[in-house]
From Swiss-Prot:
Full protein name: Ribonucleoside-diphosphate reductase large subunit
Organism: Equine herpesvirus 1 (strain Ab4p) (EHV-1)
GO terms under biological process: deoxyribonucleotide biosynthetic process; DNA replication; release from viral latency
SS bonds (residue pairs): C224-C453
Entry function: Ribonucleoside-diphosphate reductase holoenzyme provides the precursors necessary for viral DNA synthesis. Allows virus growth in non-dividing cells, as well as reactivation from latency in infected hosts. Catalyzes the biosynthesis of deoxyribonucleotides from the corresponding ribonucleotides.
Underlying gene: RIR1
GO molecular function: ATP binding; ribonucleoside-diphosphate reductase activity, thioredoxin disulfide as acceptor
Length: 790
């Protein structure tokens, strides 16, 4: 079958499009680099090989010519089309695609309409997708488009078709969901069109599991699982791994696993404490990821008073003393009570002898406490002598930071903030004990149910109103477009929640009872650049808050409308803060609302009718999904203006197209443009490093990277929008080493203290270090980085 398909004649339309793109390359002045030509009447295989040679030849030139980056992306899409099957029914019947029977039936029932929609897509949205760039095209080709036998691959239209059809079917099952999604006439074609337009137009970007498995009889659609089993020894741990963690990992779900109650210190008969369990989890994760499919991961959650905390912090990389305790395939997160930072602040204020006490399982009840109750019980246990060890608070802080910088773990979250701002009063239920793999999901998990979250993000550059070329208008942010996108995303994720199957009974129970949404954003920095705003400017900071507020408002409004139209609120609504008329931002002081009247009306509606979902907004990292949009990741500034990574298949390049186009506009002479790019290259693509401190308003001054912004400003921007992010934000720190290569731990701790004082829930996801040298060493009280996580 492979020989027959790939050796068949390539469709003439594809050949003509390939020739057109190659002509454009010649027009750009690169004809001499195209050493080969297509043979007459080429086969699909010959066209594939030709496109690959052209792209591989021109890829290095993308560093200096953004037009080639776009054309190479268009060529990769032509490579995709060369492998597409024109017969829709072949795709429908493919055993590799394994379409769900319900999805297949819906497509066949509306086949004429769908074929017209796909034809229109080919001549409109698809052209825009093809012009995004090389990384977008490669990500679709290599990861998201399902593969079939004989070298075939599903088309872009078929990809969006299976997602839109799946969502449409489960939306149509509930008339209220359909009525919230579209105004006016409600019918299958109207619902499908709404979803297909949002997906194909890249306004709504589903999470990776939905893109991979949506509409198919394989995989799970949920992204995040939070597990809090009652694990106190190896027997209970093995049971939890086999019954819960194993099935979830095999379904490619990411896990956050609370293990604080496994707190028996090393002793006779138990020589390695919790480290033996962590080694087992590490090996399990490595084995499951060895098949080459979508990798998954585990983050284990511990509080900093755990008896084995120092061993946990030394389990990765060069900090591990030997292979028996090395756990490079999992991450750790410090689930940190306020008391820890209060004591560290006392040390900063000059108090001597401030200690931090470690406890074993005699203090396991501290897991269930937070706030004043935790503080009083912790200090009582100290006074009663139950501690197993005491460490100077600054030494404990140093160990945490050293591990984060040298190994990428631990992450750090603030236990009290996560519990205080939750939508239930947890003093009756017991405290939340952990988050998910990426530190943005806040849910109460216990022995009876897992926390589960289904994710999607809004591509903010698609919410800009862009005036036609050669007109006097300027771009502006369209809040109405964001509001529509938020409502669509709310119904879409609810539909996918209903469509999904879950690996374990406890996971299914968590979905059924909480209906937790995780709606986030991507392309915040890209949107600011398109609006000609520096990310740290007052205008950008104001817009940053307004975006989060509108996202929460319209998502909650859609959820409340579902209940007003007859759907039942989530289980436990009557016991939640929502039933009292409290909204997520009410627990934050001094919040200014841009939509005060809308919130007042919504507050009344929620009290009267309820909320279908219990949670709404989570600012997740969008590492993979933002590659298909060519937007900046999540809410972070870009890490670099030219991403370059060498992989087994060659170099991956992703230039900042907005920067490249700006340089072309201000340096119209080719020699001047190339000189500017050469200067940038020597400065590691730092505009500041290449051209110095440019005046405010200069066309290049806004192109700073994450490492060039004051990290306190980025933390403040997280705090500004925190009242409207009812879950959390995967906030990373971006630190540049000093020229001498010595990075004091106190510098990073000062940022964590700032995040704590600003009331964030996540203090540090990754600590990304831009190295000054490659000769990092560890001396005295200073940290010198030894790895770079770019």
């Amino acid at each position: 079958m492979a020989l027959n398909f790939l050796q068949s004649d390539c469709p003439l339309a594809i050949i003509q499009d390939v020739i057109s793109r190659v002509d454009a390359i010649s027009d750009y002045g690169y004809a001499n680099e195209l050493s080969t030509t297509l043979p007459p009447r080429p086969s699909r295989s010959q066209v594939l090989e030709y496109i690959t040679r052209v792209v591989d030849t021109l890829k290095p030139r993308c560093r200096v010519d953004e037009r080639l980056y776009v054309v190479c992306g268009e060529l990769v899409h032509l490579r995709i089309r060369t492998r597409n099957v024109e017969d829709l029914k072949y795709w429908l019947n493919s055993t590799e695609i394994a379409l769900n029977e319900i999805v297949e039936k819906d497509i066949l029932d509306h086949l004429d309409f769908i074929q017209r929609t796909l034809h229109a897509f080919e001549s409109s949205e698809y052209r825009e997708l093809c012009a995004l760039g090389l990384q977008s095209a490669l990500k679709y080709e290599e990861m998201y488009l399902a593969k079939m036998r004989g070298g075939r691959i599903e088309s872009m239209g078929q990809f969006f078709l299976r997602l839109a059809t799946t969502a449409t079917h489960y939306t149509m099952e509930e008339p209220a969901m359909a009525r919230v999604l579209v105004s006016g006439e409600v019918g299958w074609t109207y619902i499908f069109k709404a979803y297909f337009t949002a997906l194909a137009g890249q306004v709504l970007i589903p999470a990776t599991p939905i893109m991979l498995f949506g509409g198919r009889d394989c995989g799970s659609l949920a992204s995040c699982y939070l597990l809090n089993p009652r694990v106190t020894d190896m027997n209970s741990a093995m049971l939890a791994l086999m019954e819960e963690a194993g099935p979830i990992l095999c379904n490619r779900g990411g896990i956050g696993l609370s293990l604080q109650r496994f707190n028996t210190p090393p002793k006779e008969g138990c020589s390695r404490g919790v480290m033996a369990l962590l080694k087992l989890i590490d090996s399990m994760t490595m084995a499951i990821n060895s098949d080459g499919e979508r990798p998954t991961g585990v983050c284990v959650y511990f509080e900093p008073w755990h008896a084995d905390i120092r061993a946990i912090l030394n389990m990765r990389g060069m900090l591990a003393r030997d292979e028996t305790v090395r756990c490079d395939n999992i991450f750790a997160c410090m689930w940190t009570p306020d008391l820890f930072f209060d004591r560290y602040q006392r040390y900063l204020d000059g108090e001597s002898g401030v200690m931090w006490t470690l406890f074993d399982d005699t203090a396991s009840h501290l897991c269930h406490m937070y706030g004043k109750e935790f503080e009083e019980e912790y200090e009582r246990l100290e006074q009663c002598g139950f501690g197993v060890d005491s460490i100077p608070i600054q030494d404990m802080a140093f160990i945490i930071v050293r591990s984060a910088v040298m190994t990428g773990s631990p992450f750090l979250m603030f236990k009290d903030a996560c519990n205080k701002h939750y939508h239930f009063d947890l003093r009756r239920k017991g405290a939340i004990m952990g988050s998910n793999l990426c530190t943005e999901i806040i849910q109460h998990a216990d022995e009876t149910q897992n926390g589960v979250c289904n994710l999607a993000s809004i591509n903010l550059p698609k919410c800009l109103a862009i005036p036609p070329p050669h007109t006097a208008g300027v771009p502006y942010f369209d809040f109405a477009a964001l509001g529509r996108a938020a409502a669509t995303a709310t119904i879409f994720v609810n539909s996918m929640m209903r469509a999904g199957t879950y690996p374990t009974v406890k996971s299914q129970r968590g979905v059924d009872e909480n209906r937790s949404l995780g709606l986030g954003i991507q392309g915040l920095h890209t949107a600011f650049l398109m609006l000609d705003l520096d990310m740290a400017s007052p205008e950008a900071r104001q817009l940053n808050k307004q975006i989060a507020e509108r996202l929460l408002l319209n998502s909650m409004k859609a959820s409340a409308t579902l209940c007003r139209l007859g759907m039942k609120p989530f289980k436990g609504f009557e016991d939640s803060k929502y039933s009292l008329g409290e909204l997520p931002f009410d627990s934050y002081p001094g919040v200014t609302l841009a939509n005060r009247n809308a919130w007042r009306r919504l507050r009344t509606e929620i009290k009267q009718h309820g909320l279908y979902n219990s949670q709404f907004v989570a600012y997740m990292p969008t590492v993979s999904s933002s590659q298909v949009t060519e937007s900046s990741e999540g809410f972070s500034p870009v890490y670099t203006n030219l991403f370059s990574k060498v992989t087994a298949t060659g170099e991956v390049l992703r230039p900042n197209l907005l920067l490249m186009r700006t340089i072309r506009s201000i340096f119209p002479r080719e020699c001047a443009r190339l000189q500017a790019l050469s200067t940038l290259e020597m400065a590691q693509w730092s505009v500041v490093g290449a051209f110095g401190d440019l005046p405010v308003g200069h066309p290049l001054s806004k192109f700073k990277t994450a490492f060039e912004y004051d990290q306190r400003t980025l933390i403040d921007m997280c705090a500004d929008r925190a009242p409207f992010v009812d879950q959390s934000q995967s906030m990373s720190l971006f630190i540049t080493e000093p020229a001498d290569g010595k990075l004091p731990a106190s510098k990073i701790m000062s940022l964590l203290v700032h995040a704590y004082k600003r009331g964030l829930k996540t203090g540090m996801y990754y600590c990304k270090i831009k190295k000054a040298t490659n000769n990092g060493v560890f001396v005295g009280g200073d940290l010198v980085c030894t790895s770079c996580s770019l």
